[in-house]
């Protein structure tokens, strides 16, 4: 299992930097088909939401879609997936910032 940081996840998702995006994608593709082989901690998720919202001007709906897609990816493992799902539901249904309880 490897751990990835916010930068790798942002580059993979946004494909905003040709060189870094290719490297991030290649790294993640090495683990395709291997369940729970890429660890993402809670801080990375919080930073991802902040970067997508503030830096890339993603809407709340776009961020929710990205988070649900990430959490549905079998290769990714999380610090506490149940709490993260609850955080997404809270974020989706209330006028709040994204918080991990």
Model-derived regions, located:
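Short beta->alpha linker loops
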Residues: 43-44, 82
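Active-site neighborhoods of divalent-metal-dependent phosphate/nucleic-acid chemistry enzymes
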Residues: 75-101
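Amphipathic alpha-helical segments within well-ordered protein domains
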Residues: 49, 53, 68-71, 88
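Acidic active-site catalytic centers that drive phospho-/nucleotidyl reactions
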Residues: 5-7, 47, 100
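Short, well-structured N-terminal submotif of metal-dependent ribonuclease cores
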Residues: 1-40, 55-61
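Glycine/small-residue-rich phosphate/adenosyl-binding loop
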Residues: 57-67, 71, 75
């Amino acid at each position: 299992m490897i751990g990835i940081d916010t930068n790798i996840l942002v580059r993979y998702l946004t494909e905003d930097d040709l060189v870094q995006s290719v490297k991030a994608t290649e790294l993640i593709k090495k683990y395709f088909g291997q369940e729970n082989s890429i660890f993402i901690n809670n801080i990375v998720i919080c930073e991802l939401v902040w970067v997508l919202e503030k830096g890339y001007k993603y809407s709340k709906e776009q961020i929710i879609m990205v988070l649900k897609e990430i959490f549905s990816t079998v290769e990714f493992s999380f610090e506490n997936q149940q709490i993260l799902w609850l955080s997404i539901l809270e974020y989706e249904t209330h006028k709040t910032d994204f918080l991990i309880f």
